[in-house]
Design a protein with these regions (language model features):
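C-terminal regions of proteins
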Residues: 277, 281, 288-324
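A charged, amphipathic alpha-helical module
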Residues: 57-197, 235
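Gly/Ser/Thr-rich loops at beta-strand to alpha-helix junctions
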Residues: 10-17, 165-172, 264-271
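C-terminal hydrophobic structural anchor segments
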Residues: 236-284, 288
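Redox- and metal-dependent alpha/beta enzyme cores, enriched for Fe-S-associated oxidoreductases
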Residues: 166-238, 242-245
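Gly/lys/ser-thr-rich phosphate-binding loops in alpha/beta enzymes
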Residues: 1-70
Length: 324
């Protein structure tokens, strides 16, 4: 890998991230660095108050303009407004299709599993402004819609429907296939959840970005950010969702329970899991929390974790019988 000309960083979610690139740029590579400033309104802020809206939009606007100035200075090129408008247009369309795919997963039987969700996020995270992402999510939407129309699910018989909280063990997405052999489907995930799409006027794409950033953050805040204010940050990466949205998911996705992965190498994505467990308990919905890692297989004990899932399914079955 060659030496970069400059570095772009962010303090979003992961508390040491802000210092990582700063340390690399000042102590190792000696290159310029720009760190974006996260936006995290308090969970109890009145997001309908125009004064609060203008305060945070001014922060977003200043940060974005500073980043543009930094990039123009480093590259010697001016921002191509037309290209930026095209990127914004593509991202709005791609996000809309992706959101509709997740809405289709409310169907019974569920047409798309978590193992596919965690692989289908890649264009959303890295190619959202490209036409390739629009084409990908449009085709995915059509495929999943056809499955729903035909009543085709991932597994022949769904016994349990779950929500997933946290980052998955990337080295073992087959975990979701194992759950499916037990009749359990993960139908919705909190991490990387795209949220309701926001359409904005792109006459001035920079200001459109500011508005979309604010509206996205506002939506996330109003869905509950009491456990982790960073979830209302506008970045497409999301560590989780709020309590109000979780409550809605229980009914909309007909969830019988939830599974949370407490991952050792990304603490931020584990924040609020006990809080969410308490919220679900009030609704009579059980939730299990298991611990391992998202990238280190040494933290994985296959027999032990599978036994935890088997025990949890017995609890879920008991809850279902009590409700029937």
């Amino acid at each position: 890998m060659g030496t970069p000309s400059f570095l772009l960083g962010s303090g979003l979610i992961c508390e040491p991230r802000f210092k990582w690139f700063q340390a690399i740029a000042t102590h190792f590579l000696k290159v310029p660095v720009f760190n974006d400033d996260p936006v995290s309104p308090p969970y109890d802020a009145d997001m309908e108050d125009p004064r609060i809206a203008e305060h945070y939009k001014a922060q977003i606007r200043a940060s974005l303009n500073a980043q543009i100035a930094f990039l123009e200075g480093q590259t010697g090129k001016k921002l191509d407004i037309g290209r930026f408008r095209e990127i914004m247009k593509n991202s709005q369309e791609a996000i809309r299709y992706w959101y509709e795919v997740l809405e289709l997963r409310k169907a019974v039987p569920c047409p798309m599993g978590s193992e596919d969700y965690f692989t289908a996020i890649i264009p959303f995270l890295y190619l959202a402004g490209e036409r390739e992402a629009v084409d990908f999510y449009r085709d995915l939407y059509r495929e999943v819609k056809e499955r729903v129309d035909r009543g085709v699910g991932v597994i022949p018989e769904e016994r349990y429907r779950f929500g997933w909280l946290g980052i998955p063990p990337w080295f073992n997405l087959g975990l979701f296939n194992y759950l499916q052999t037990l009749g359990a489907m993960v139908c919705i995930e909190s991490t990387y959840y795209v949220g309701h799409p926001v359409e904005v006027d792109l006459t001035d794409p920079v200001e459109g970005w500011v508005e979309r950033t604010w509206q996205t953050g506002k939506f996330k805040n109003q869905q509950g950010s009491e456990a982790n204010p960073d979830i209302c940050n506008p970045g497409v990466f999301n560590p989780g969702v709020g309590g109000e949205l979780i409550k809605r998911w229980v009914s909309e996705y007909r969830l019988d329970g939830a599974i949370a992965h407490r991952t050792r190498s990304c603490r931020a994505t584990s924040m609020g899991q006990l809080h969410m467990k308490n919220i679900l308990a009030e609704l009579g919905v059980p939730m299990m929390i298991f611990e391992s890692d998202m990238v280190d297989p040494r933290a994985w004990s296959d027999a032990q974790i599978k036994r935890q899932f088997q025990d949890f399914l017995e609890i879920v079955e008991t809850h279902k019988k009590r409700k029937s």
